Design a protein with these regions (language model features):
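Beta-propeller domains
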Residues: 1-381
Length: 381
């Protein structure tokens, strides 16, 4: 069963207050793949017509995208712990689902965490020490690792939050953090993690830059092992689609594309990659500077690609110039930052009526944008 909602962690740009809001996931999807393909064809026609109208000197920018509109009312409001008594020096560092779309964990810069239950509208404050030891393991666990591992603090770079998923809210036992064995590459100075994913119910794959290798962590035996001198082809996390028996993620070589591979075909060899390209919405103007791109798994082969941009059109201080050498910018100037949410659906080959594509196809659905004025989207989970 697919997800019903996308959770947005939003910051009030004026007060610094954060809130949790939700939008229906089906807002990003057409009723059918046929309707999506017809809409994409019309969008491409509009794109081409706009470029032709401006003699190839101007990019459509947001003109071919839908506006998300006003954000829904907040379900929760919260604020990070002030840093040294200074309210302006505070921020959230982390947001994640806990088992399902209705339970969210949020942590601030000081390590304080809260759990939000969207259905019961309840909050669990969890300020327990993150270095708790013990052998009690609940039904589900959330694993958290520093993306850039520091050898001096490696003993605390990998932790797990144990909790129960049998309750709809947080009225059960208080979740607790436990430190785990650091990864083998933690002794390297520049051991940045490039990609990671869950392979089965008890195994996590992690690829690192230094050295270029992929490792597996057994969550039952709590042991690491080296898989080989290869890295997964993803930038950040990858998600498994059981209907297609493939892992999908943003490509490390092409950040505006998806790629897919089978990580279990032969763990000793690099996985074979299938590139899946997005289309119009990711043909961006040169003045759009991306600083956050994420892939959200909605289930049943559906994804939401989250792209947050800062527009630098006309900002000479950032070295932006119009490469067309004319008086027209490559898109209408957009002030500040904005987000683009795109619904994608991965489907297998049809295999009938001679329409077999010979592999997985990507169907692009809707792309919707939201300008950051009074509110900024910090996380989509």
């Amino acid at each position: 069963m697919g997800r019903r909602f996308l959770n947005l962690v939003v910051e009030n740009a004026r007060s610094g207050l954060y809130s949790l809001r939700r939008i229906p996931a089906n807002h990003l999807f057409y009723p059918s793949t046929r309707a999506a393909e017809e809409a994409t064809a019309k969008s491409q026609e509009s794109f081409n017509a706009y470029v032709k109208e401006h003699h190839g000197r101007k990019h459509p920018g947001l003109h071919t995208l839908e506006m998300l509109g006003k954000l829904p009312s907040p379900m929760f409001n919260f604020e990070p712990t002030p840093w040294d008594g200074q309210r302006r020096h505070r921020n959230l560092e982390f947001a994640s689902l806990l088992g399902n779309e209705n339970r969210i964990l949020i942590a601030d810069h000081s390590g304080h965490t809260i759990g939000c239950a969207a259905i019961s509208l309840s909050i669990k404050n969890n300020n327990s020490n993150k270095n708790i030891s013990g052998d009690m393991w609940d039904e589900d666990s959330l694993y958290v690792m520093s993306q850039s591992v520091d050898p001096e603090t490696k003993d605390y770079c990998f932790e797990v939050l144990n909790y129960t998923s049998s309750c709809k809210d947080f009225r059960g036992r208080t979740p607790c953090w436990s430190s785990l064995q650091p990864p083998p590459f933690a002794n390297y100075m520049h051991a940045d993690i490039t990609s990671y994913t869950v392979v089965d119910s008890s195994t996590i794959y992690v690829s690192s830059m230094e050295p270029d290798a992929t490792y597996a962590f057994d969550t039952v035996g709590r042991q690491w092992r080296r898989l080989g001198c290869w890295t997964m082809p993803f930038d950040g996390k990858a998600e498994y689609v059981p209907e297609l028996k493939l892992w999908f993620g943003l490509s490390v070589d092409h950040p505006y594309s998806l790629c897919a591979c089978d990580l279990l075909s032969d763990a000793a060899k690099p996985p074979t990659v299938q590139q899946q390209h997005t289309w119009v919405d990711l043909d961006i103007p040169e003045s759009w500077l991306p600083y956050n791109i994420d892939l959200i798994n909605l289930g049943c082969g559906r994804f939401c690609v989250v792209k947050i941009f800062r527009s630098i059109a006309g900002d000479c201080t950032l070295g932006f110039s119009d490469y067309d050498d004319d008086d027209t910018m490559d898109s209408d100037p957009i002030q500040g930052k904005f987000a683009v949410l795109t619904g994608l659906q991965m489907v297998g080959p049809c295999g009938k009526d001679g329409d077999d594509q010979g592999g997985v196809r990507m169907i692009k659905h809707k792309s919707m944008y939201y300008n950051f004025w009074d509110y900024e989207i910090e996380w989509v989970i």
